[in-house]
Amino acid sequence: MESAFIIEKSVVIVVVFAVTMIMAMYSTWAERKVAAFLQDRVGPNRAGWGGLLQPLADGMKLFSKEEFFPNTPNRFLFVVGPAIAMSTALMTSAVIPWGDRLHLFGKDIILQATDVNIALLYIFGVLSVGVYGIMIGGWASNNKFSLMGAVRAASQMVSYEIAMGLSMIALLMMTGTMSLKVISEQQAGMNWNVFYQPLSFLIFLICSFAETNRTPFDLAECENELIGGYHTEYSSMKMGFYLFAEYASMFISSTIISVLFFGGYNYPGMQWMVDNVGVNTANLLGIAVLFVKICFFIFFYMWVRWTIPRFRYDQLMNLGWRILIPLSIINIMITGAVILRHDIAAALGF
C-alpha cells in the first residue's frame, strides 16, 4: 500500500513539474506572438509550424552559449542564485489542486501532489525565498548595476508581499481554511470568491505583477537599456534560468488566482457530468477548464506588458505602501464587520 502511494505521488509530482516547465516554455512563444499581434507583426514563424519549436530553439541556443564567470570571489553563490529563483517557482506548484480525482486501475488518484492545510502559508513562504535568489545573484555578480537591480527587485517584492498577504487575510476570514483543495471545493458551480471579495482579487492581481517583476513593475530589469538588471553578468543557462523563472512564476501566479478567486477546476454542471457521464470525463473537463482560466490570465499579463508604461520607482513604492496596504486593511475591517453581522443575525434567528 505504501509503495503504491509513493509511486502514485511520484508520478503526480513529475507530471506537475513537467506541465509547469512546458507551460512556462511556451509562454515565451505566446509572449512573442501577442507582442507581434499588438505591433502588427508576424512573430516567430521559422522554427516549426507557426514557430511552435521556437522555445526549443531558444533553449538550445542558451545551452550552447559560452559560460561566463565575472571576477567574483563568490562563484558558488553566483551559481546558486538562478537555481533558487527557478526552484521556488516549481516548488509552489506542489500544493495546487489541478483537478478533483481520476479513477484509474481500480483506485482514485488525487490530482494534487500534496494537500496540506497550510497551503497558502506554504506558498507565501516559498515565494519569499525567491527574493534570496535575486539578491544573491545580484550581489555575487560583483557589479554595482546588478546589485542595484537586485536591491530594487527585492524591495519591490517584499513591499508588495505585505499587501498580498493582507488581501489574503480577508479571503481566509470568509473561507475559514488555508487548504487550496477546500477553497476550490467551496466554489462549486459559479460560487466564485471573486464575487464576494472583489477588492481582495484586485489587490492580489496588482501585487502578482510586482511579485513576478512584470510590466509595469519591471524596474529591476529595464529591457530597453544597456544594463539588464540583476542578471546583467549572467549568460548561458544561468541567464536562461532567471528568464525562465519569470515565466514559471507568471504561470503559477495565474494558477493561484484561478484557484483562489475563480473556482479552480470547478465549472457549472460539474456534478451533473459526474453523475451522467462519468468521473474521469467530468474531471478531465475540469482540468481543461482550469487551464483555460490560467491561459486567460497569462494573456492578461502579456497584454498589460505591451499596453501600459513602466512606473517610476517612487510611484511603485507609493502604490504599495500608501494605497494597496491601507486598502487591504480596510477590506479586512469590512469583511470582519460583515461576518460579525451575519453571526449576530444567525444567533438571534434572523
Swiss-Prot record:
Q: How does it sit in the membrane?
A: Multi-pass membrane protein
Tell me one Pfam family matched here: NADHdh
- What reaction(s) does this enzyme catalyze? a quinone + NADH + 5 H(+)(in) = a quinol + NAD(+) + 4 H(+)(out)
Assembly notes: NDH-1 is composed of 14 different subunits. Subunits NuoA, H, J, K, L, M, N constitute the membrane sector of the complex.
Source organism (scientific name) = Flavobacterium johnsoniae (strain ATCC 17061 / DSM 2064 / JCM 8514 / BCRC 14874 / CCUG 350202 / NBRC 14942 / NCIMB 11054 / UW101) (Cytophaga johnsonae)
Which top-level enzyme class is recorded in the Swiss-Prot or TrEMBL entry?
Answer: translocase
User: Any idea what job this protein has?
Assistant: NDH-1 shuttles electrons from NADH, via FMN and iron-sulfur (Fe-S) centers, to quinones in the respiratory chain. The immediate electron acceptor for the enzyme in this species is believed to be ubiquinone. Couples the redox reaction to proton translocation (for every two electrons transferred, four hydrogen ions are translocated across the cytoplasmic membrane), and thus conserves the redox energy in a proton gradient. This subunit may bind ubiquinone.
Name its cellular compartments. Cell inner membrane
- Enumerate the InterPro entries for this protein: NADH_UbQ_OxRdtase_su1/FPO, NADH_UbQ_OxRdtase_su1_CS
**Protein's UniProt name:** NADH-quinone oxidoreductase subunit H
